[in-house]
């Protein structure tokens, strides 16, 4: 539901991975005066993306909040905090995490699909529950590693990076034509040194008032203990 100042986001999903599980998400964005907006989001059993191992066998209960300040129309400041409880898809508790992210950016234009550059810094703290994994989660652990919760929970890190984004569409805004979008960036963290992210995709309508998005992403950074990860993403959104 979208009102004059407030936008609500309600979502439910069913995931097929190591185990099948449902998820719920509820969030709100509230627009204040002078280009300032506040937002929050609560999640139950949603996919955990803080590491590739969590993405494969984990999920999270999370709460995030923050604000976005559109300073001049092209320059902006965004701050977000996240509190996360990590669980295996079998239901076993794995640990928890807290992150703070600060973005300072500049848009090159005022179009709905904005192109811009941003400086981003993140501080992330993680704590693993100190106990062995159950048999199903242990099946994901290589034979030379200990089968405990440390396998899933990433290291705490501090990271700063510069990123160029282009062609990004606002989720709630319909677009009539197909467009390319992507992100290129470099970063450095205190745990894994220099890293990068590269993402390229296309999105546009298929049947009319809808949007299909296809993209590929490859990254290597402190967010995943310096490990390289690749993702192929397909999303479909129907407007009404």
PLM regions: where:
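Gram-negative and organellar
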Residues: 1-240
């Amino acid at each position: 539901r979208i009102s004059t100042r407030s936008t609500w986001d309600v979502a439910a999903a069913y995931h097929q991975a190591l185990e099948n599980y449902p998820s719920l998400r509820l969030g709100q964005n509230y627009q204040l005066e002078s280009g300032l907006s506040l937002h929050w989001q609560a999640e139950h059993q949603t996919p955990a993306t803080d590491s590739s191992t969590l993405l494969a066998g984990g999920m999270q209960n999370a709460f995030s909040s923050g604000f976005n300040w559109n300073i001049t129309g092209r320059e902006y400041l965004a701050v977000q905090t996240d509190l996360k409880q990590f669980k295996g898809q079998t239901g076993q508790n794995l640990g928890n995490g807290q992150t703070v992210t600060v973005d300072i950016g500049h848009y090159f234009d005022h179009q709905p699909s904005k192109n811009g550059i941003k400086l981003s810094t993140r501080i992330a703290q993680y704590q693993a529950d100190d106990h062995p994994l159950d048999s199903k989660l242990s099946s994901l652990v290589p034979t030379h590693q200990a089968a405990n919760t440390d396998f899933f929970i990433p290291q705490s890190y501090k990271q700063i990076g510069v990123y160029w984004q282009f062609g990004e569409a606002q989720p709630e805004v319909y677009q009539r034509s197909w467009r390319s979008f992507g992100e290129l960036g470099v970063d450095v963290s205190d745990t894994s040194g220099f890293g990068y992210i590269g993402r390229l995709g296309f999105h546009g309508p298929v049947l009319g008032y809808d949007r299909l998005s296809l993209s590929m992403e490859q990254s290597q950074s402190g967010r995943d203990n310096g490990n390289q990860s690749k993702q192929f993403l397909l999303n479909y959104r129907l407007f009404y």
